[in-house]
């Protein structure tokens, strides 16, 4: 019996599920001939159905009095009377103005709206119903600006949120709806349109001048603020075309600050394109520029490309770099540094970004700041150095590594003495902005068991321990040669070495050398030296360039690289436009067999007196003369690394024949001097006295298991042969392009034989870095290892600088 009881209950529930008392149904009035008419209003009749014991509401069709629509069928008389009263007051304007209403589906929608939104006026209902003819009814027109509902919104608000442009036109043209009326949240129709999905609605609203376009809601947001917050790029575009103001202050600043806060790049770009001054606007709360609000590298890069001041300060004195470090945003930090942010800028309480980084336990960020010039012993307003901050905040393991690093410059871990305030007074003055720990001396730290021992010497290497104040003698009697290896993005290592030489000598690289030779990336840097570009600038350029050039898979598109070279050196600049120092770039002429080394020069080539190694071929086109050679094409030709980029015409990467151009440069100088003597200009010849060769870092040596290539007799031998062929191919390429080893030995021996000072500077890297490496962390670590190398070879650097500065 219990089973049958549960079955009956289940069937009853299912029946109730499908029996909706408010389901609209088309009926014949003849079916109600025996029913009593309880109420009657216009075309609506409330009938008591005796057979079903229900109260039915029937809408008599104006077109056919014999038929109608049952709007509900209720068992409670009280409920029936309430609903009948509601229907009778709301339905007449609809069936009186449009025959489209007289359909079951439309009536169902309309009656559901009436029940679900009892506070809505007939005009609100008409908007949701979406039948245009209804808006010509006098009663619907009369309620066009009504706010009598739970949200306090007008029918125009609903039309905008719905995105119905046709209904919007009806409301504005026939019903004279006002566009500046606000709802309970202070929002106008423009706010609602922004939250919709139809930009055309916003465009139609903007055709008529209205204060609602720039009205702030209860949260202080204009429609433009709201569009930026929601990332509605097209809405932002339409608002700006409708002359929405960009300079209205919201709770978080101008709309540009809102776009930056929510990382809406497209919206920010729209605003800046309309009003470029917005890029410098300051928010009211922090006095911060849009760059301070950048939360990722993409947003920061977008602003910086458009000329945003990278070192702009907030009301507290902090730069965007301070904020990025505080938020531990390494990608943002790298973008700011590569666009020239001052790594040593003093912000609130005199803190530099390095002070703030010490509390983040992010070694990569600390390395990046130091590599880009942050001083490790700069005290803040409380006299605290980064070392002191590290000793009080950082986690144990990282703290040990950081203190090991900073101890090498004699950083004081005690709370320092501030002029006019004793240590005890300053300690009792109150909590420090960073922490409120005791100012006691931390325990002595042993340097024997600390992690990251290689970090120890870096900071000291950056100190001007061997800076010499003497300047170059312009009438130097000997020539200096600088040779730069190839190596792709590892050219950053060369840049870091040159920065160290410039810092130690106090003289620009261009003024230290008379000859500069470069291959591939070294060729680009040679041209940068020729055109007086600072190495600090080139370091940032390289970090930015890699993301533009190394996109997709190899071989990479040549377009981005060529555009980069044109942008840096000019599209029409010729090699001979700048005469000093003399520069040569290596390239490989690949339109002949065997291939030949070609030098792109900014001077006339010496006349050859030796017999050519091959019989001249009249079918081969001669190289372009220096006076006609475009600088960017020379750089592109020298850097056309096979499998990385397609050849530049007939030129391949110079690294195929001279990845270390030292011997080729010395040969060129000798031939140039001999040519000068033959021409009777021997008085202009200067003896070469110093050769400086800079590498892009030595990869660690690893064992190779097999380079055997043979005809296999079984699957196992086939796999072994394939692996051996791969290793052999890699070895052949490495041998052809090896800038170290015997190439360095030969150059050093030659220099020693003729009495030339030879310096080979090439740091050992901890890992093999590819030519197209794009990871900021990997490249920063390579520069860090370069800084370690600089310190370890500081005596060699000191000797080099002394020789370079001597007459």
UniProtKB/Swiss-Prot annotation:
The superkingdom listed in its UniProt entry is Eukaryota
Q: Which GO terms describe its molecular function?
A: 1-alkyl-2-acetylglycerophosphocholine esterase activity; ATP-dependent protein binding; calcium-independent phospholipase A2 activity; calmodulin binding; identical protein binding; long-chain fatty acyl-CoA hydrolase activity; lysophospholipase activity; phospholipase A2 activity
Give the Phosphoserine positions (modified residues).
13
Q: Catalyzes what?
A: a 1,2-diacyl-sn-glycero-3-phosphocholine + H2O = a 1-acyl-sn-glycero-3-phosphocholine + a fatty acid + H(+); a 1-O-alkyl-2-acyl-sn-glycero-3-phosphocholine + H2O = a 1-O-alkyl-sn-glycero-3-phosphocholine + a fatty acid + H(+); 1,2-dihexadecanoyl-sn-glycero-3-phosphocholine + H2O = 1-hexadecanoyl-sn-glycero-3-phosphocholine + hexadecanoate + H(+); 1-hexadecanoyl-2-(9Z-octadecenoyl)-sn-glycero-3-phosphocholine + H2O = 1-hexadecanoyl-sn-glycero-3-phosphocholine + (9Z)-octadecenoate + H(+)
> Could you tell me the keywords of this UniProt record?
ANK repeat, Calmodulin-binding, Cell membrane, Cell projection, Chemotaxis, Cytoplasm, Hydrolase, Lipid metabolism, Membrane, Mitochondrion, Phospholipid metabolism, Phosphoprotein, Repeat, Transmembrane, Transmembrane helix
The family database entries (SMART domains) matched by this protein are listed as: ANK
**Where do we find the motif DGA/G here?**
653-655
Q: Where is this region: Calmodulin-binding (1-9-14 motif)?
A: 678-687
Tissue-wise, where is it found?
Expressed in pancreatic beta-cells. Expressed in skeletal muscle (at protein level).
Q: CDD domains given for it?
A: Pat_PNPLA9
Cite the PNPLA domain residue spans from the record: 482-666
Activity control, as annotated, is:
Activated by ATP. Inhibited by calcium-activated calmodulin. Inhibited by bromoenol lactone (BEL).
Q: What is this protein called?
A: 85/88 kDa calcium-independent phospholipase A2
The scientific name of the source species is: Rattus norvegicus (Rat)
Gene that encodes it: Pla2g6
